[in-house]
A protein has these predicted regions:
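Sec-dependent bacterial lipoprotein signal peptides
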Residues: 1-24
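Generic alpha-helical propensity signal that fires on short helical segments
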Residues: 19, 106-111, 117, 177, ...
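N-terminal "mature-domain start" segment
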Residues: 27-80, 178-194
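Second-shell loop/turn segments in exported
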Residues: 34-38, 86-92, 163-171
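Short, solvent-exposed recognition patches
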Residues: 48-146, 150-151
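A short, solvent-exposed beta-edge/loop patch
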Residues: 124-194
Length: 194
């Protein structure tokens, strides 16, 4: 009888963990539903002041000569944690359709695993140093060789929101999309479900 009770008890514990794990996994699937689409027109026109109003810190203003159709472009950083802010490149266009039609090719060129980071090969080389991330051994000492490559892409993806293209860092596409969405949600707060 005691053996039956202990087996039943273990089965109950196992069932609890399976149920809990399933509930957590299903809840995680719904998080994508709340994300702002990668290309989205909320029907408004943005400026750098809209980003600064939510805590975006502008580091550099880029010369947009050669950046097809863009009104202006900036390099800066943002994050909900002031000690863990991430880098972004922001490009503003006259309209949402201009951002899509004129800005997509150069955003593709600047982001992702196949980003073009050689100044001589880029269609718009402005800010190329800011678009690179250094990886490798940068230390010194008996084991270190001090070899470091600064040819890795910093921006892994982008969002086109209103008249803005937002290039986002992150180390991989999934993280970059999360970082894009995090910033965009401060501009476009979630509406409550009714």
């Amino acid at each position: 009888m005691n053996r039956f009770i202990s087996i039943s008890f273990l089965s109950l514990i196992a069932l609890t963990f399976v149920t809990l794990g399933t509930a957590i996994a299903c809840d995680g699937e719904n998080s994508d539903e709340a994300a702002i689409p990668r290309i989205y027109d909320p029907g408004k026109k943005l400026t750098i002041e809209d980003l600064q109003a939510v805590g975006f810190k502008k580091s550099k203003t880029y010369d947009v000569e050669g950046l097809v159709g863009a009104d202006n472009a900036y390099y800066g950083f943002w994050g909900p944690d002031p000690y863990d802010r991430k880098d972004y490149e922001v490009r503003f266009f006259p309209s949402h359709s201009d951002a899509i039609e004129l800005g997509t090719a150069q955003a593709d060129e600047r982001s992702g695993e196949d980003a073009i980071l050689d100044k001589d090969l880029m269609s718009w080389p402005e800010g190329v140093k800011d678009a690179r991330e250094c990886k490798g051994d940068k230390g010194s000492g008996p084991v270190s060789h001090g070899v470091q490559s600064c040819k890795s892409p910093k921006y892994w993806d982008y969002s086109i929101y209103a008249n803005m293209i937002l290039l986002c860092s992150g180390g991989d596409i999934e993280t970059a999309r999360i970082l894009c969405n995090d910033l965009l949600e401060t501009i476009e707060p979630k509406t409550s479900d009714n």
